[in-house]
Amino acid sequence: MYELITEKTLPEYEAFVQSHPKGNFAQSYLWGKQKPMWQWDAIAVRGEDGKIKGSLAVMTRKVPGIGRTLMYGCRGPVCDLDDRETFSQLLDGAKALAKKYKSYVIKIDPDVPSGNTAFSSMLQSFGFKTKEGGKNFEAIQPRYVFRLNVEGKTEEELLANFHQKWRYNIRLAERKGVTVRICGKEMIPAFADLMLTTGVRDGFVTRKPEYFANMLDNLGEHARLYMAFDPVGTPIAGTLAIHYGDKVWYLYGASSNEHRNLMPNYLLQWRMIQWAVETNCRIYDFRGVSGDVSEDNPLYGLFRFKQGFGGDFTEFIGEMDLVLSPAIYFAVEHGTSVFKELRKKVYLIRNRGK
């Protein structure tokens, strides 16, 4: 039997998600606050002892013009992946919410490696189908990431596992006078400017400054803005990271077109990894890379940069969709892909030269 999380049971829910090995910041109520255009709900299932043993947070948003909604359980569920009965009850709760909100699909992208074919088969038995896509960044969340196991390791042990050139670049940045500070919202404008520069340089759409400022507000102590400064105090790179449960995630990164020879990005990564060590985390997650690791892929440089820190290349099972209205699903999914590509082209044209 499932239950919907209420204001009264929210602290218990948050404690469960934070402590579970499959816990993820995207399943937190705090992340729901970061997405005010979405309706946030959470479903829980309790064991015989009365404690929560499984949960699924879903966000629902209206699709303009069709009177239906998209339901999305980002990086859910949070439960024992072998517990079919618990997942079945969580899905019952999601279906009830989908009926209430007139959702045309229930979409999930679990924190589950692609090698777990048993879980994929279980999802398929419930009617989920794999969302086909490319190997780059076509999905909502990255399917391919690098993850570094930091559990029980010292900084010296982690450094020893880095590629020697990466260790050299970290020390070079320090020798050249690069400093990294944890900053507040006063540095958001500078970070957003660096994000815009990076987006135009690398060909992706970036967020507005308000989004990053709200992240620091909504996630509080769970979020950090790291800024790197050159020897005269000019901001030359920055990152946004999230610590939740036993993981730290590298969420956003940006850098100037100048002073790249000072290697600020290497030092920024090391500072975030140190945060994971300081907070006794199990995993430092570098987040997305391309699944196409051929050297002629324009995204290969990003892959190589993250690979050099000694993490494990991880492929998730990807987006899984439970289609509730096939005709609307086809129309929306096709239209969304076309719109995203058009928006990207317009954005890059408008910001070229800024």
Region spans (language model):
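Aromatic (often tryptophan-rich) hydrophobic motifs at membrane interfaces
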Residues: 88-97, 213-217, 222-330
